[in-house]
């Protein structure tokens, strides 16, 4: 997870988008300086391009694929899984969309802790099969998005 950013370290405009749990997967409404970003990125864990970021608070399980752009994420509310080459990120994104996280059902304030993630068993087919599954669902998501856009266009006629 990224290092905590305090409100006084952000501004409404600036160099580096800062995503909080409410803006994660959307448009940033806060920014941090390039200097702070460079310092924190060099000192603290930071995702790699292609990593799947996951919301651990609020709308638990919302995922975003990290594009590699210069942007920063709210401390323990947005996390990612560092893993080896036995797990494909596109497959992991599909898995995150269907997993039932143990230990969070019924709690008043929903929160996904490291133990919830680390103790979750992931059935892992071969990497080649994971890639096929991940690619299939990514293409399916793209087709659904295109059809939704077409529906919006048709409704606006």
Which residue stretches match the model-derived regions?
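Feature detects amphipathic, helix-rich regulatory segments
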Residues: 1-157
